[in-house]
């Protein structure tokens, strides 16, 4: 870069007036001209839509959470801690920031690879008007058109804009000791690596695993037969450690000796008991006399008492002549294991994944399922037996299958959170012909069938083989318009003419039923109250398996949570209910710190009466009004 260095400058008298050197200002101007922001942001990946993708990561979801009451109340599901969430994973991740931040042990995702044949196009809609987008990001008309060009496209920028906010939000859900594993192929691998370096930090990179997904060499390429794909692994912080794997059969065969009369417990190998003088921490110097009388004085790794314990336990090898330098005997079955490698050539292939689907369904209802052996390996590396696994590209449900199978094998209590879109299946697919309408139906059915298979094999099992199901739905525009017409000051719905408005939401006469499963156009039988309560509980930081206790106040059903919080959503609250509630609190029958009310269900007089009554109590109770 010689063009950025200047020479010393002298005046006409030969006096030095400016020392030469590196011209930082000129260098910065050159960087700016080339749109390189190295000095302030460091090395980073840029793509069309990046600023908008960052904006999306900070937005709140406009969806509500609808419990599948018919499913969740079944005996096998009502006490389950597993979750299946149907909806756009961006919306789901936004909601989960409230109640699952810093709680997930491991994330695995198998996102679309953007190969051109996997059907990926940028699906997210722009949530702002053109003018708002221009004002937000300082775009001119040409730049705005460039931004919106990614919609419905499968370009690299479209894929990165799709993935960025999801990965950004996913990181926040991980514990500080957590890991994320992402399956990907050559097409977006380089871009994904750069994006993950930016979101998780380069220091968060753990490894890039090459998984041999296909054992056969195919003739579908003129150059190279693709047999593997990548699994990128990142840690949220440096606090987590991947677990050791059991010693492989190949390693034991190569490195361990067969059992002998002297060491009959199993395959074993001798390891040195000596240490080098240069090792920090030193060692222990003493004399050891071998069985044949040979004396060795060296720097030993163990204190003399510990050495004598090894001898007593028959864990010291003195060589074939019983006079060699003593070595410790390590049995293979006593080993804590070995680190995994970044090349997995002995894990099940995609062919096994397809066979598992065929065995469960009797047909190939899913095109590209990952094998459960791959997920089991990842899960065992990343979490303990009681960890939480999140997969927000759930696909065929392999992750749930792996969690349930592992728990059955080792008695673990791992739980899963799965999310997938209710994407409609094409009419010519095998799954559609088999009676499935959406991808999420296949995933849930797989979990159900795996559970049945485990129960059939082990009727006495007490593992968690169920799951709670929730749908993430957008209220109708008419419902939103009705909500906007509510005047908090008067407690009435006002139309555009300033007159009292009749509800225009067809079939409903209140602002609860539009949020029922029927009102939102989804199955499951949820009441509007159940949807509102579930959405609020998540927003207030409660897990989705939190126990909710109905409390009766003079014929009015309230919902009590966490021994501190009361939710009043239904209509028909009046003086009698207020009196009953105040009596429960005042006589210490019911500890309450906060009462949350659905403002649309309460008239102003009832709210004022409740506010006055709460202020007269000896204890402070917060009243939160939501509209």
Regions found by a protein language model. Name each.
Residues 1-63, 72-76, 81-82, 90, ...:
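Accessory, often C-terminal, charged low-complexity segments
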Residues 87:
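Cofactor-binding loops of NAD(P)H-dependent oxidoreductases
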Residues 109-111, 392:
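Conserved beta-strand/loop positions that form the S-adenosyl-L-methionine
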Residues 125-134:
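Charged, low-hydrophobicity low-complexity segments
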Residues 386-395:
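Conserved class I S-adenosyl-L-methionine
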Residues 396, 401, 416:
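Phosphate-binding glycine-rich loops of NTP-binding sites
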Residues 400-410:
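Conserved SAM-binding loop of SAM-dependent methyltransferases across substrates and taxa
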């Amino acid at each position: 870069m010689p063009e950025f260095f200047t020479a010393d400058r002298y005046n006409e008298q030969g006096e030095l007036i400016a020392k030469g050197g590196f011209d930082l200002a000129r260098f910065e101007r050159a960087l700016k001209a080339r749109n390189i922001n190295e000095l302030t942001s460091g090395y980073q990946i840029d793509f069309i839509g990046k600023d908008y993708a960052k904006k999306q990561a900070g937005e709140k979801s406009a969806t509500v959470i609808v419990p599948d009451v018919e499913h969740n109340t079944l005996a096998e599901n009502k006490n389950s801690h597993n979750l299946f969430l149907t909806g756009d994973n961006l919306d789901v991740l936004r909601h989960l920031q409230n109640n699952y931040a810093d709680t997930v042990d491991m994330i695995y995702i198998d996102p679309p690879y953007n190969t051109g044949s996997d059907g990926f196009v940028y699906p997210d809609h722009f949530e702002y008007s053109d003018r708002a987008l221009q004002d937000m990001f300082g775009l001119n008309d040409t730049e705005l058109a460039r931004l919106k060009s990614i919609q419905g496209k499968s370009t690299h920028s479209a894929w990165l804009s799709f993935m960025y906010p999801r990965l950004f939000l996913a990181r926040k859900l991980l514990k500080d000791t957590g890991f994320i594993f992402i399956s990907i192929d050559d097409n977006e691998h380089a871009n994904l690596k750069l994006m993950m370096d930016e979101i998780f930090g380069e220091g968060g990179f753990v490894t890039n695993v090459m998984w041999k997904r296909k054992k056969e060499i195919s003739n579908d390429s003129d150059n190279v037969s693709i047999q593997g794909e990548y699994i990128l692994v990142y840690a949220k912080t440096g606090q987590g450690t991947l677990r050791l794997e059991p010693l492989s059969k190949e390693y034991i065969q190569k490195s361990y000796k067969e059992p002998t009369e002297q060491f009959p417990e199993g395959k074993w190998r001798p390891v040195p008991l000596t240490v080098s003088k240069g090792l920090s921490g030193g060692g222990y110097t003493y004399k050891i006399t071998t069985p044949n009388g040979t004396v060795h004085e060296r720097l030993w790794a163990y204190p003399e008492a510990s050495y004598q314990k090894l001898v007593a336990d028959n864990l010291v090898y003195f060589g074939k002549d019983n006079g060699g330098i003593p070595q410790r005997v390590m049995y293979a079955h006593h080993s804590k294991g070995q680190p995994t490698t970044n090349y997995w050539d002995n894990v099940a292939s995609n062919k096994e994944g397809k066979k598992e689907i065929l065995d469960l369904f009797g047909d190939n209802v899913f095109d590209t399922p990952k094998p459960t052996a791959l997920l089991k390996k990842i899960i065992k590396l990343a979490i303990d037996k009681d960890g939480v696994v999140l997969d927000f590209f759930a696909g065929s449900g392999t992750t749930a299958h792996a969690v349930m199978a592992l728990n059955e094998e080792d008695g673990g209590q791992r739980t899963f959170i799965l999310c997938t879109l209710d994407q409609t299946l094409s009419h010519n697919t095998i799954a559609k012909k088999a009676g499935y309408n959406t991808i999420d139906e296949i995933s849930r059915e797989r979990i159900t069938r795996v559970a049945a298979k485990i129960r059939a094999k082990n009727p006495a099992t007490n593992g968690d083989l169920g799951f709670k199901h929730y749908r993430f739905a957008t209220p109708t525009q008419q419902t939103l318009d009705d909500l906007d017409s509510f005047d908090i000051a008067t407690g009435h719905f006002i139309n555009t003419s300033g007159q009292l408005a009749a509800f225009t939401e067809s079939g409903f006469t209140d602002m609860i039923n539009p949020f029922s499963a029927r009102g939102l156009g989804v199955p499951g039988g949820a009441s509007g109250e159940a949807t509102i309560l579930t959405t609020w509980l998540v927003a207030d930081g409660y897990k989705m398996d939190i126990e909710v206790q109905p409390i009766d106040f003079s014929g009015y059903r309230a919902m009590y949570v966490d021994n501190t919080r009361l939710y009043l959503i239904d209509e028909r609250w009046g003086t009698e209910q207020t009196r009953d509630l105040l009596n429960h609190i005042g006589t210490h029958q019911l500890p309450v710190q906060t009462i949350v009310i659905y403002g649309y269900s309460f008239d102003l007089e009832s709210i004022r009466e409740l506010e006055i009554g709460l202020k007269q109590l000896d204890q402070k109770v917060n009243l939160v009004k939501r509209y």
